[in-house]
Amino acid sequence: MTSNKSNHELPEPIDALYRIKRGLSGYVSYLAACEMNESFSEYVLYEPILRILTARGYSVECEVECPGVKHEKKGDRKRLDFVATRNGLAFALEVKWANRRSIDIKQDVLKLVAYRTASNSARAFLCVFGRQSILMNLRLKAENLEQQGQIVTADLGKTKYSCRIYEQKSPNKSQRVTR
């Protein structure tokens, strides 16, 4: 696996997020070796994310109703993929499998913004996973997203899988352009 940064002694939740990037890249490479490619979707990523977060001591809820989102109809509830808490630290994580260089993340970002607004000190992240050839040239059409750390890629000789994580930042914070 390749990454351009040493990750010793990272603070939480950044350490857990780095482990998620490493874990997902290797896990999906393993599934590809098992010829499981037909079943690939973002849902394949849920179990390893849950395992990594719980191994890091987080209490994790999946498919959590998103606070602060108005619901159009009865039963039409927007849900966050993950909400993790540990020692007063809380964050939401939305997961997206990128099949092309330009992906629709509008609903994911709306949920992350609503979560941050409803949860004063909480953080919110978007995990984007896919083939390295796609993630290296990924175009996200959203403001206030800042990449956390470097892209992580499992380079095992066949298809290379990569993972990036972005933090949803408040509009009043300085922004930097990321790919």
Q: Which residue ranges define each predicted feature?
A:
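Interdomain/boundary linker segments immediately adjacent to catalytic/signaling cores
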Residues: 1-55
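Active-site metal-binding core of divalent-cation-utilizing nuclease and nuclease-like domains
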Residues: 37-38, 55, 59-88, 156-161, ...
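Feature marks short, surface-exposed loop/turn motifs that line or immediately flank catalytic pockets
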Residues: 68, 99-101, 132-133
